[in-house]
């Protein structure tokens, strides 16, 4: 089977794990007036890519992919625990937990997942989404670079989808933003794959604060 098909499957917004219900703090930033137009959205997303995704979340995900591919389950669980510990708010923690749970349910219902993989998934209580994604990538023999690229694409696409619901920006404006951000997505991919353990860093205090405020936001469309 062409490895492109399962890659597109995992990156698809149609994957039934509920990603469309989360904005990862973007809705809160809009409500506070931090984000209000295309330029401010681009700055918000660029900062997320540079200060969080490229140098922390994507490198952790790459390590989980490598560990799963090599059958190093203790390493996989170690990096998954690092990821869970970095969820600084209840909403961000619940987001990853819920989508991880939903992806486990999906994989358990598919013939591709063998018994060994099912057993390993049972070894982590409430597995976060990137851990389950890594197991899925192993199941379909996806290489690390392609899987991280798909992960980054899924993150950006979901952010733009949330933006179109929460701001009066149409699909064309979102596509223009996508064109502007794709080179930064390339940079994020290369940074993530080259990141050493000593370089892992997460400096998005604004995201954490926005996420905390969102927990008590009076009117909201999204769960984060």
Swiss-Prot record:
It is found in: Cytoplasm. GO terms for molecular function: nickel cation binding. This is Urease accessory protein UreF. Belongs to the UreF family. Gene3D superfamilies: Urease accessory protein UreF. GO terms for cellular component: cytoplasm. Required for maturation of urease via the functional incorporation of the urease nickel metallocenter. UreD, UreF and UreG form a complex that acts as a GTP-hydrolysis-dependent molecular chaperone, activating the urease apoprotein by helping to assemble the nickel containing metallocenter of UreC. The UreE protein probably delivers the nickel. HAMAP family: UreF. Signal peptide: none annotated. It holds the Pfam family UreF. It comes from the Bacteria. Its main location: cytoplasm. Keywords: Chaperone, Cytoplasm, Nickel insertion.
């Amino acid at each position: 089977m062409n490895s492109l098909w399962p890659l597109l499957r995992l990156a698809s917004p149609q994957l039934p794990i509920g990603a469309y219900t989360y904005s990862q703090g973007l809705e809160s930033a809009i409500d506070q007036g931090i984000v209000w137009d295309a330029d401010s959205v681009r700055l918000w997303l660029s900062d997320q890519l540079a200060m969080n995704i490229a140098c922390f979340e994507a490198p952790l995900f790459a390590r989980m992919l490598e560990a799963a591919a090599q059958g190093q389950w203790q390493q996989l669980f170690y990096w998954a625990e690092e990821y869970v510990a970095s969820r600084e708010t209840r909403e961000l923690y619940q987001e990853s937990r819920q989508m991880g749970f939903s992806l486990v349910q999906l994989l358990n219902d598919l013939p591709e997942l063998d018994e060994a993989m099912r057993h390993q998934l049972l070894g982590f209580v409430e597995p976060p989404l990137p851990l389950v994604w890594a197991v899925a990538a192993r199941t379909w023999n996806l290489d690390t670079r392609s899987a991280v690229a798909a992960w980054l694409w899924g993150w950006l696409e979901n952010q733009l989808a949330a933006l179109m619901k929460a701001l009066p920006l149409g699909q064309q404006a979102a596509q223009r933003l996508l064109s502007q951000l794709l080179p930064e997505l390339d940079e994020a991919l290369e940074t993530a794959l080259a990141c050493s353990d000593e370089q892992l860093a997460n400096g998005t205090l604004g995201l954490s604060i926005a996420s905390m405020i969102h927990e008590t936001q009076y009117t909201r469309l999204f769960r984060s």
